[in-house]
Amino acid sequence: MKLNEVVPWGRSLAEYRAMFNLSEAELRQRILGCGDGPASFNAEMTERGRSVVSVDPIYQFSADQIRQRVQQTYEPIISQVKQNPDRYVWQTFRDADALGQARLATMEKFLQDYEVGKAAGRYLAQSLPNLAIAHPPFDQPFELCVCSHLLFLYSDQLSLEFHITAIDQLLQVAQEVRIFPLLQLDCRLSPYLEPVMQDWSDKGLEVEVQTVAYEFQKGGNQMLRIVKD
C-alpha cells in the first residue's frame, strides 16, 4: 500500500454502534474491527475497558504520516461531498462542514491513541484476505467481527472472489461477521450481496440483512450478518 493512494476517513464509536446494531452486551465481547482505518472505535472502546483489535494496512504508517495524509485529503473529500449533497442524508450531520469537523475530531482521537495502541497490539498492519490467522491475536477466536466501509462498498475494485475469500477468512477467526454498508460508492446495492448470501447460506450458516439505525449514504441503512452455529 502507498499512503498517497489512501483516503483516511474515520468514524466514531457512536457510529459503529448504530451501523452494526451493537448492544451493550455485544460491546463487552472480544471484537475484531476490519478496515477500521482512522476510526476512533478502538480508542473509545479501550477507554471503556473493552476489547477491540483493529486491522488495516494503513497501520504500517506512523501517526505523523497518517495525520499528514488526513490534512492532504480533507478539503478534496469535503468538496466532493458538497458537490453531491443529494447522495447523503443530512440528519446526523447538519451539512458538509459539520461532517468534516466531526470526522477530524474522530480521527484526532484515533491518532492520539494510535502509537500506544499499536505497541499494545490493538492496531495491526494487515489486510484481507491475508490475515496471519495462525498467530496472535487470531489464534484465540473473536466473538464478533465488524467490517466497515470496505466489502461491498468497493465492488468495482474488489472482485466477488475477493469478497468470498475475505469473508471466509473472517469467519475462521470470528463467530459472527457483520458488514456495513451494502451499497457501492455510487449508492447502488452491491451486485455481490446476493451471491455472497447464497454462498454462506448453502454452507449452513445463518445469513440475514438487517436494517440499522444509521443512514448517511442515501439508502445505506442495512448491514449483513453471517453467524456460525
Which residue stretches match the model-derived regions?
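Class I S-adenosyl-L-methionine-dependent methyltransferase module
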Residues: 47, 51-125
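Class I S-adenosyl-L-methionine
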Residues: 185-229
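A short acidic, Gly/Pro-enriched loop at the edge of an enzyme's catalytic core
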Residues: 129-146
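A short, conserved alpha-helix within the catalytic core of class I
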Residues: 154-169
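A conserved beta-strand element that flanks and buttresses the S-adenosyl-L-methionine
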Residues: 146-147, 178
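Conserved beta-strand signature within the Rossmann-like core of class I S-adenosyl-L-methionine
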Residues: 166-183
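Residues lining the SAM
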Residues: 148-152
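Class I SAM-dependent methyltransferase Rossmann-like catalytic core
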Residues: 1-30, 40-48, 60-71, 76
